[in-house]
């Protein structure tokens, strides 16, 4: 360590010290930083091509990967292949959090391929790795030669016993009723992701206000490290549309774009008319610009649509589909439409439609989740699918991408606080949201449809849950908050803010801001208030369709019963080589799951089959009771008496003197092998040996 040239910047946030280190690991990267808190260490590296991609684009070619090395927690990966492979759900979600925090801060027109990798090197099981990953990633970019100049920091805000905590420990997080990851710059908020247990709108705002001072401290620390170890930024030249094309667009085509947007067409009609206008534009400039004509026309039309749609909102308070800023699209819902599914709902909001289906399973159907900190069974799952046909696109079906995983997790987090506890409803629950149509807010359709589907399945939820996506149009000091945004408003707007919850409070919160300076707390307060109003309107609609969970689960769902047996009886229930449990499941047509703590779950196709399996289990795991009368089977005859099997695996001695009231010379005078005999337990000694009597019953 003596030859290492390390530069360090320490910063205290709350009561915890965070260290930023550079100059000693991954030195060939454009920027590399280790963020450390306690014994938790996250290395982030930033590498960029120095050449712009050809063409004009407003898309930043940024790739972010968050990786957890199992050695960080002193573990070896499970499974057949003993190495890390496909990204876990946590790694995917953490990658999205980092990406969403960084992307708005890259300069306009920057198209150099850029990779950011955050790698967990050490995990002490105390401190969170995700906020350290955001911090390390931003700092790696700040000190690098990459033209990324605005630091972004993230903190985790939890509320424990009514008190807000900055960066709670992993143990504290388990008891928090609110858990938000919030990132921002010195200017404002950029990204929020988290969940809560039906908290108020005011509580969420307080959490954001608690986060801002901590974010400012962390951003300043990055700038201080840059002063010590920063590199000179390389310059780039962004390509632009030729001025003659811009002028033609403004002078001839702007008015036509405005007319199309002011006609309040539906998505398909509007897209067709804009495409026709683009084709005419491209044809007009083809002679002057050749093969670039279509690209230049497309970019110009995109810019004109951006400007005119925003002007429509800010100047007239009207959106491109004719709605007011706080107006919700038309709602329509159906439940119980799939006869064999355990629960189903078709939720439609405008041109966005989700088919959401609930399936009930047993504890054996739970998803095993393994992380650096712990392993556990996930008994509530929500999977989101976004096929190409939902937007009229012809594209191949592939495995779920980051977007699908992220949307599914948001919807799962929204519904999770309202799912009943396992002791009240012992089913594993899987909800699948298949998006049938999409024109914005499909994740919120998954939440609303998911709630209705769970109600239809007879899941006794604590309350119904609705969700809404909000947008923002901001030019200077003038702005408008939009309720229930559609696809165009998401694409051309400055914010995508999603809020979910019951009538009692908020359960999930997600926000992404495209403005480099973020947005203020004041705008967020207005957005939250407007979102709550819209969410209650949607909730009223849902209540009109299915106001409460159905009283019973589907007749096609398994019948489940949970019981507990002594842990020392688990072996007796399973039997040698699984003989006993296999016999029970086959003869009763049931599925039986046995936990190490003695909890046994029986799933059957009907109540009769379940009762048969339950009786078999009780028989195999019962304890012999003193003074109780049993009908047992003679399994062994000895000169001194007979051994009688009282319950499976448990015999008692019936001494020759206890067989009959009169004296007998041989046991065989009264009993023979296989006889069923009624006996009473008269003694159980300290070693568990059982003595029986027949004569006391004669």
Curated annotation (Swiss-Prot):
UniProt xrefs under InterPro entries: ExoRNase_PH_dom1, ExoRNase_PH_dom2, ExoRNase_PH_dom2_sf, KH_dom, KH_dom_type_1, KH_dom_type_1_sf, NA-bd_OB-fold, PNPase
GO biological process: mRNA catabolic process; RNA processing
Catalyzed reactions per annotation: RNA(n+1) + phosphate = RNA(n) + a ribonucleoside 5'-diphosphate
Residues annotated as binding Mg(2+): 490, 496
PROSITE patterns: KH_TYPE_1, S1
Residue ranges annotated for the KH domain, each copy included: 558-617
Organism listed in the record: Elusimicrobium minutum (strain Pei191)
Matching Pfam families: KH_1, PNPase, RNase_PH, RNase_PH_C, S1
Family according to the record: Belongs to the polyribonucleotide nucleotidyltransferase family.
GO cellular component, as recorded: cytosol
Localization (cell): Cytoplasm
NCBIfam families xrefs: polynuc_phos, PRK11824.1
Enzyme Commission designation: 2.7.7.8
Full protein name: Polyribonucleotide nucleotidyltransferase
Principal EC category: transferase
Reported function: Involved in mRNA degradation. Catalyzes the phosphorolysis of single-stranded polyribonucleotides processively in the 3'- to 5'-direction.
């Amino acid at each position: 360590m003596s030859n290492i040239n390390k530069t360090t910047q320490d910063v205290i946030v709350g009561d915890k010290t965070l260290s930023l280190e550079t100059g000693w690991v991954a030195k060939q990267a454009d920027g590399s930083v280790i963020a450390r808190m306690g014994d938790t260490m996250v290395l982030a590296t930033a590498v960029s091509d120095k050449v712009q991609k050809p063409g004009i684009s407003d898309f930043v070619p940024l790739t972010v990967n968050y990786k957890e090395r199992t050695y960080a927690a002193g573990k070896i990966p499970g499974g057949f292949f003993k190495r890390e492979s496909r990204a876990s759900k946590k790694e995917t979600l953490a990658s999205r959090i980092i990406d969403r925090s960084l992307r708005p801060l890259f300069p306009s027109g920057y198209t150099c391929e850029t990779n950011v990798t955050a790698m967990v090197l050490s995990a002490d099981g105390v401190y969170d790795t995700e906020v350290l990953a955001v911090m390390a990633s931003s700092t790696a970019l700040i000190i690098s030669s990459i033209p990324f100049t605005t630091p972004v920091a993230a903190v985790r805000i939890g509320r424990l016993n009514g008190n807000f905590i900055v960066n709670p420990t992993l143990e504290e997080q388990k008891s928090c009723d609110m858990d938000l990851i919030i990132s921002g710059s010195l200017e404002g908020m950029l990204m929020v992701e988290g969940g809560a247990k039906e908290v108020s709108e005011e509580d969420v705002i307080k959490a954001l206000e608690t986060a801002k001072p901590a974010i400012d401290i962390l951003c300043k620390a990055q700038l201080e490290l840059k002063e010590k170890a920063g590199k000179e930024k390389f310059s780039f030249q962004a390509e632009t549309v030729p001025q003659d094309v811009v002028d033609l667009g403004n002078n001839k085509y702007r008015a036509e774009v405005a007319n199309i947007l002011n006609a309040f067409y539906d998505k398909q009609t509007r897209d067709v008319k804009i495409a026709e206008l683009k084709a005419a534009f491209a044809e007009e400039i083809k002679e002057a610009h050749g093969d670039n004509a279509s690209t230049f026309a497309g970019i110009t039309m995109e810019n004109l649509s951006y400007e005119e749609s925003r002007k429509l909102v800010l100047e007239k308070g009207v959106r491109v589909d004719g709605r007011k800023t706080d107006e919700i699209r038309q709602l329509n819902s159906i439940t119980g439409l799939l006869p064999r599914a355990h629960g189903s709902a078709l939720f439609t909001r405008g041109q966005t439609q989700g088919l959401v289906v609930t399936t009930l399973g047993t504890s054996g159907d739970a998803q095993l989740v393994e992380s650096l900190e712990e392993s556990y069974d996930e008994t509530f799952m929500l999977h989101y699918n976004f096929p190409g046909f939902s937007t009229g696109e012809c594209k191949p079906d592939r495995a779920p991408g980051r977007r699908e995983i992220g949307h599914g997790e948001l919807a799962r987090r929204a519904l999770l606080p309202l799912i009943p506890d396992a002791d009240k409803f012992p089913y594993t629950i899987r909800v699948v949201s298949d998006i049938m149509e999409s024109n914005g807010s499909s994740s919120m359709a998954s939440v609303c449809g998911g709630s209705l589907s769970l109600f239809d399945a007879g899941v006794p939820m604590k309350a119904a849950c609705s969700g809404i996506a909000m947008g923002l149009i901001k030019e200077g000091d003038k702005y408008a908050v939009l309720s229930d945004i559609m696809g165009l408003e998401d694409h051309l707007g400055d914010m995508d803010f999603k809020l979910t919850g019951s009538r009692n409070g908020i359960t999930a919160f997600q926000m992404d801001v495209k403005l480099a300076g973020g947005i203020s707390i004041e705008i967020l307060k207005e957005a939250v208030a407007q979102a709550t109003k819209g969410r209650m309107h949607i909730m009223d609609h849902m209540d009109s369709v299915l106001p409460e969970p159905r009283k019973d689960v589907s007749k096609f769902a398994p019948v489940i019963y949970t019981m507990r047996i002594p842990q020392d009886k688990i072996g007796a229930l399973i039997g040698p080589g699984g003989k006993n449990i296999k016999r029970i499941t086959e003869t009763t047509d049931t599925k039986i799951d046995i936990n190490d703590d003695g909890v046994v779950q029986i799933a059957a196709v009907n109540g009769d089959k379940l009762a048969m399996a339950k009786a078999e289990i009780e028989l195999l795991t019962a304890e012999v009771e003193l003074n109780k009368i049993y009908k047992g089977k003679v399994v062994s005859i000895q000169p001194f008496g007979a051994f009688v099997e009282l319950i499976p695996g448990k015999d008692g001695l019936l001494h020759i003197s206890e067989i009959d009231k009169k004296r007998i010379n041989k046991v065989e005078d009264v009993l023979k092998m296989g006889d069923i005999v009624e006996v009473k337990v008269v003694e159980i000694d300290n070693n568990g040996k059982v003595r029986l009597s027949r004569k006391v019953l004669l």
